[in-house]
UniProtKB/Swiss-Prot annotation:
<protein>
    <recommendedName>
        <fullName>Glycerol-3-phosphate dehydrogenase [NAD(P)+]</fullName>
        <ecNumber>1.1.1.94</ecNumber>
    </recommendedName>
</protein>
<keyword id="KW-0521">NADP</keyword>
<feature type="binding site">
    <location>
        <position position="140"/>
    </location>
    <ligand>
        <name>NADPH</name>
    </ligand>
</feature>
<keyword id="KW-0443">Lipid metabolism</keyword>
<feature type="binding site">
    <location>
        <position position="11"/>
    </location>
    <ligand>
        <name>NADPH</name>
    </ligand>
</feature>
<feature type="binding site">
    <location>
        <position position="10"/>
    </location>
    <ligand>
        <name>NADPH</name>
    </ligand>
</feature>
<dbReference type="GO" id="GO:0006650">
    <property type="term" value="P:glycerophospholipid metabolic process"/>
</dbReference>
<dbReference type="InterPro" id="IPR013328">
    <property type="entry name" value="6PGD_dom2"/>
</dbReference>
<feature type="binding site">
    <location>
        <position position="105"/>
    </location>
    <ligand>
        <name>sn-glycerol 3-phosphate</name>
    </ligand>
</feature>
<dbReference type="InterPro" id="IPR008927">
    <property type="entry name" value="6-PGluconate_DH-like_C_sf"/>
</dbReference>
<dbReference type="GO" id="GO:0051287">
    <property type="term" value="F:NAD binding"/>
</dbReference>
<feature type="binding site">
    <location>
        <position position="31"/>
    </location>
    <ligand>
        <name>NADPH</name>
    </ligand>
</feature>
<feature type="binding site">
    <location>
        <position position="191"/>
    </location>
    <ligand>
        <name>sn-glycerol 3-phosphate</name>
    </ligand>
</feature>
<keyword id="KW-0444">Lipid biosynthesis</keyword>
<comment type="similarity">
    <text>Belongs to the NAD-dependent glycerol-3-phosphate dehydrogenase family.</text>
</comment>
<keyword id="KW-0547">Nucleotide-binding</keyword>
<feature type="binding site">
    <location>
        <position position="105"/>
    </location>
    <ligand>
        <name>NADPH</name>
    </ligand>
</feature>
Length: 335
């Protein structure tokens, strides 16, 4: 089997490494020559994962046509804000009747489209039944280190879901399939917003009680907006929901938690983002999530406060204080 991977960031590289480790021939699309040379000559992604050796069956190319055309499966892993542009570039080369697996997370700024909506808008209908979406608690470095990991595979087509599940499943990588595309996407996107809040709490020196509170109430917000969009509430108790939320809010490798932590320590958002080599999806997703909650008429207190902190300059300490001063209410999820 020959597989093309679109996106040479840490997660796309990790998924490519996993598939190559299984014995598949994998080619990774990179945008710069030095990265291509480093992967092909030294088996190292010098930009994103410089301390890890990649399998020999994983190669790289700058030629998008070479990466996509004639492949038996396509894995798409660009940042969500770049996804539309990438899909427009690749669709003339896309093979028909092969699985297309998205690992992007986020909600598009402006249009407020979920990743699945972007795919279905940009690609002809003949590709739609072959689309699937991978999400779950999975740091890239730990996948490459072969640490036992679980993820969700969501597709509206059961045949596609089961095929992708079988291709990705390995000794250290277990997959669960679900038809709930919306639930998997909402969980994978909004957990990054909550992780920003958890990082701020840690940066301010608050304890684990506060982090647990943010995770708990964050799951409430994720579930509320998911239900409004038609998701199955049980999805949010699975890998792409609670699993990914816990990892992203607590793990030191979490880019979104790191951004929040540094904000809590007093750095500006501009300083933080200019120093990072990877994309923290939660920053852009916060804006989309805030606008989506306003559009749907859903109260999302944590999301609203993170938005005010990122885009209106609100002091992080005031954010936490205002969350604690909110009106008392009954526990539960209602939309």
């Amino acid at each position: 089997m020959k597989i093309g991977v679109i996106g040479s960031g840490s997660f796309g590289t990790a998924l490519g490494s996993l598939l190559a480790d299984k014995g598949y021939e994998v080619i990774l699309w990179c945008r710069n020559d030095s990265q291509v040379e480093s992967i092909n000559r030294n088996h190292i992604n010098n930009k994103h994962l410089p301390n890890f050796t990649l399998p020999e069956k994983l190669t790289a190319s700058k030629d998008l046509r070479n990466v996509v055309q004639g492949k038996d499966m396509i894995v798409s892993s660009p940042p969500s804000h770049a996804l539309s542009e990438v899909l427009r570039e690749i669709k003339e080369y896309l093979p028909e009747k092969v699985p297309i697996v998205s690992a992007s997370k986020g909600i598009e700024n402006g249009t407020l489209r979920l990743v699945s909506e972007i795919f279905e808008s940009e690609l002809p209908e003949k590709y739609h039944s072959y689309l699937s979406y991978l999400s779950g608690p999975s740091f890239a470095k730990e996948i490459i280190q072969k640490v036992p990991t679980i993820v969700s595979i969501a597709s509206k087509n059961e045949t596609t879901a089961r095929k992708v599940q079988e291709i990705f499943s390995f000794l250290y990588f277990r997959t669960y399939w679900t038809p709930d595309v919306i639930g998997v996407e909402v969980g994978g996107s909004l957990k990054n917003v909550i992780a920003l809040a958890a990082g701020v709490s840690d940066g301010l020196g608050f304890g684990q009680n506060t982090r647990a509170a943010l995770i708990t109430r964050g799951l409430n917000e994720i579930t509320k907006i998911g239900l409004k969009l038609g998701a199955d509430p049980m999805t949010f108790l699975g890998p792409s929901g609670m699993g990914d939320l816990i990892l992203t809010c607590c793990g030191e490798q979490s880019r979104n938690r790191t951004v929040g932590f540094r904000l809590g320590k007093g750095e500006t958002l501009e300083q933080i983002l200019s120093s990072m080599n990877e994309v923290a999806e939660g920053v852009k997703t916060t804006q989309s999530a805030y606008e989506l909650s306003q559009k749907l008429g859903i109260e999302m207190a944590i999301t609203n406060e993170v938005y005010k902190m990122l885009y209106e300059g609100k002091n992080p300490r005031e954010v936490v204080k205002d969350l604690m001063k909110r009106d008392l209410k009954r526990e539960g999820v209602s939309v």
